[in-house]
Amino acid sequence: MRILHVLDHSIPLHSGYTFRTRSILREQQALGWETFHVTGSKQGASAALEEDVDGLHFYRTPKSGSMLSKLPVLNQMEVIDGLTKRLSEIIPLIKPDVLHAHSPSLNAVAALRAGKKFGIPVVYEVRAFWEDAAVDHGTAKEHGLRYKLTRALETYALKNANAVTTICEGLRRDIVERGIAADKVTVIPNAVDIDKFAVGGVADLALKRKLGLQDMRLIGFIGSFYAYEGLDVLLRAVPAMLARLPDLRVLLVGGGPQDAQLRQLAKDLGIADKVVFTGRVPHEQVQQYYDLLDVLVYPRLSMRLTDLVTPLKPLEAMAQGRVLAASDVGGHLELIEHGKTGILFKADDPQSLAQNVGDLLAAQEQWPALRANGRRFVESERNWPISVARYKAIYARLTGLAAAGTQDR
């Protein structure tokens, strides 16, 4: 089985998107499949048209230098056209059995064009609806023209793909509501590489002293500071928690668009000396910061994006046997069972966060069970071998090939 994956971007860029891709590719290769990989022009400038990264070979698509690439909306068509051309160059060389396009729909449309030209079935994998992400990032207005055009293109891709996969039940429901046959849509859930996460990490006391956090209870967040993560809700809950737990401190590890606003909010709330912002830390040091935290908090705001899409970070926390608290948005409800694998609080509500996280900090006798249940959940349901195995039936149905290794050719 030879699969050509059509991607928005990939490693060496770091994002949830690229890490999911890397995990899928490695697991598919472990099954004996040959995987090939091309990124669109949004990958950015590359020194060459082909690149090896972390043991994976990527074909790159050069950016267009035309005037159209600088115009809103029309520049998206340039992305599709450039990727379609690149696919037409690559496909005769590698002769794939399946084109597997991943979000956004620009990649799917290019793959559909190439699939029609060469007679190859297309799988479209929806990781999020990018029109909703654009609303949160401020580049589109909900139900505005750009939003509607992006949504229409998404629906076109869903209807014309031979099969559709997606990362969670929330997205699957929305896809089916667009008129896509339910039996055409398969959930390939986000997962973790269990072997990369150890349980029982011990806090680095030297790092704790360096941060001025010795002898403190620590809650916090590790990741990118996007508005939808709701870190402002966490900060607004801190004064109430401090009244109950004076030794509480908040550790925020990472950076992003909301960094400056969050630092200012901490000052405005009078808690700047109770919140530590580390900035971005090297990937190899992230584990040390996880080991410092008593409770990880994921206060995502309630909106279409967070109600439909499951995040990866809570799964990574469970894989480490961490204690976690999260808002009750739809994406979290798919992952976290209240009182069993974590605790949930009302989204967008600092008072609910303060009450529930405060109760959790005061009930340490519950932590061992929460840790064990979370780890068991990812071991049994959210690991990559189990998730990626779901592609077997999809590929076999589209190609008529047994979903095994390269001997099928």
Give, region by region, the residue ranges found by the protein language model.
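Acidic donor-binding loop of glycosyltransferase active sites
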Residues: 94-98, 162, 274, 290-307, ...
